[in-house]
Amino acid sequence: MTKKIKEIDWAKLLKVNRDVFFNLFSLNEEVAVSDEVKIKFYSLKYSGKGSDDLTFINHIYEAAVNYVFDEKDIKELIEDGYEPTDKALSYFGDIDPLTDGRYGELILYLFIEAVLQTPMIVHKISQTYNNNDQVKGSDGLFIGNINGQATLLLGESKMRNNFHVCVGDALESLKRYINNPESIDRELEVAKKHLSQDLKNLDENDLDLIYQSLRTKQIEFQEYNICYPAFLMYKEGKINNIISANKPEIESQVLEFLKSIKKRRSKYINESLPEIKNITLEFFMMPVVDVSSFREKCYTVFHNGKKYEREK
């Protein structure tokens, strides 16, 4: 009997501990707009000093090595006397954090593996296709089972200081793929050449099946549902007002505020969507006090305490 994509043991490829990841948030709630569109809201923990950005950033820092390298790469680096984490961090080069998309892509990876339980099949070091060290195509390619259905996921990430700009930019990127088979075909054509060595942990027959399924003209590709997950970090200005008021129970007040606006935010996203068919959308929404500040902190943690120096 011929094996199906959904019968592959995708869980054995997951690297993100979902329990540890979820524990970083004080808010984890979903707004189901429709069967095709799910919008999930997450909030970091808060105290009188503000949001606990550094705990979250240190977590993504520790996850970087499995994001950038597969197990074979890591093993070879250790054998050659290198520290894999140091090598992984070199991917996050000396680039202005206010414009660098790498941190958002890393967070997207964590959300997709933890929430949707679908592993990344092309590691980041292999996705760097051109001389500018920037990535063409989506911000991540994943495969797994969602609701018992084999699913191919092409992700996007945006971090903006304005909610409406963030949503607009994310949807503009997603439109490259939504109902556009040629874009998916180009993405998979490149991905086939850079598949994670971790896939070799599966059976050999599984590998052949996966490779065939990434050819859009083959019958195996038809087994997939197509999902477009998007991570959106945006500034929610009123959070800072709550913190500045310096009242007790700051975290509960922040949560009350975020819960009060999530339906309005979800409605805006839903009304902004293009017409979709035969696909699903997953939005991971992460409102913060200030996106620019969060980006700067990411750079500092990933560069051993160094702040990014801009030309004056």
List the predicted regions and their residue ranges.
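A short, glycine/Asx- and small/polar-enriched loop/turn
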Residues: D133-G137
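Extended, charged low-complexity segments
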Residues: S244-K312
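Conserved catalytic cores of phosphodiester-cleaving nucleases, focusing on short active-site segments
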Residues: I112, D139-F142, L152-M159
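Short, solvent-exposed loop/turn segments that connect beta-strands within catalytic domains
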Residues: I146-A150
